[in-house]
Amino acid sequence: MAINLFTSESVSEGHPDKIADQISDAVLDEILKQDPKARVACETYVKTGMALVGGEITTSAWVDIENLTRQVICDIGYTHSDMGFDAHSCAVLNAIGKQSPDINQGVDRADPLEQGAGDQGIMFGYATNETEVLMPAPITYAHRLMEQQAKVRKSGKLDWLRPDAKSQLTFAYENNKIVGIDAVVLSTQHAEHVSQKDLVEGVMEEIIKPVLPSEWLSQNTKYFINPTGRFVIGGPMGDCGLTGRKIIVDTYGGAARHGGGAFSGKDPSKVDRSAAYAARYVAKNIVAAGLADRCEIQLSYAIGVADPTSIMVETFGTGKVSNETLVKLIYQNFDLRPYGLIKMLDLIRPIYRETAAYGHFGREHFPWEQTDKAEALRAGAGL
């Protein structure tokens, strides 16, 4: 059989786009703590010496945007001008307005169950049984490399590590089964003084080896560690960052389709976020139930309308029952109206800042990762 290669990438919490995502979701969380009915669409832009927080927010809550922004940047690790960005001295600009009343009248209803979608759009969810968390392996392990980079950096074990980093993994598949890792790319921002030799050795021993399963590595695996040879200038000094610019990193690493809507900074009335979480929940439960090895769900909505305008299921030839049967089971077991899925997944909680780095999916403590519907789906399918 032919070997197929598939690649996914991740970025660290110190990547400029991820700084922006985390600030936007920190604002959302602080508002939801005070006002569960808030409408939030918060966008952030970061560049050398500044963070601009804007968007449309309608709420009774009061949030100290400046202090919160500085705290997030500080928690990530940008605390000194040597890194090109300093939480204590950067300018924080606030350009927040209110949500349009035209949108409000389409979303808000006297009966919460009839709450309309906050916008039209398409959302995808995906699951595969190739990892224990029912996620594609390339994105799962790319995230784990970035989590390990942050852990080692914050522990002080490699004191020359800096917050900005990227990983990329190429997996080899035969017959849709993993046969190994073909290539590992890891670039990390670092202090000026460290040698390339020490950096390569430190990254290999402290970040790569503890994360990647040895059975997938071989003498043919290629390693590219800081392949340019220098990565001192990073973070917002190296590139400006924007909320919502890492939507493939946030989801399935390119292994599934994407509807185009970003997540961070949006309250759960925005189906871009909440319905994408629900679609993951549905797909994961179908795979957990053994009804398919791989499953992709598409949902679509019209602004101001509660019921989804469509539900599509694709199992890539791995389904144990027909796609038509799966669609019926979805309608029977999941309430995919905006208010229904918010209740189903208990989404009006301050849980979003944590989602804004290292992926929204495949992390078992989030409610959309539960497999509590698997048994009912199996029974409904007659298996």
Curated annotation (Swiss-Prot):
It catalyses: L-methionine + ATP + H2O = S-adenosyl-L-methionine + phosphate + diphosphate. Keywords: ATP-binding, Cytoplasm, Magnesium, Metal-binding, Nucleotide-binding, One-carbon metabolism, Potassium, Transferase. Binds 2 divalent ions per subunit. InterPro entries: ADOMET_SYNTHASE_CS (IPR022631), S-AdoMet_synt_C (IPR022630), S-AdoMet_synt_central (IPR022629), S-AdoMet_synt_N (IPR022628), S-AdoMet_synthetase (IPR002133), S-AdoMet_synthetase_sfam (IPR022636). It is found in: Cytoplasm. K(+) binds at E43. PROSITE patterns: ADOMET_SYNTHASE_1 (PS00376), ADOMET_SYNTHASE_2 (PS00377). Its main location: cytoplasm. Disulfide bonds: none annotated. Its EC number is 2.5.1.6. One of its GO terms (molecular function) is ATP binding. One of its GO terms (biological process) is S-adenosylmethionine biosynthetic process. ATP binds at H15, D164, A165, K166, R230, F231, D239, R245, K246, A262, K266. GO terms for cellular component: cytoplasm. It comes from the Bacteria. Pfam families: S-AdoMet_synt_C, S-AdoMet_synt_M, S-AdoMet_synt_N. L-methionine binds at E56, Q99, D239, K270. Homotetramer; dimer of dimers. Belongs to the AdoMet synthase family. This is S-adenosylmethionine synthase. It comes from Actinobacillus pleuropneumoniae serotype 3 (strain JL03).
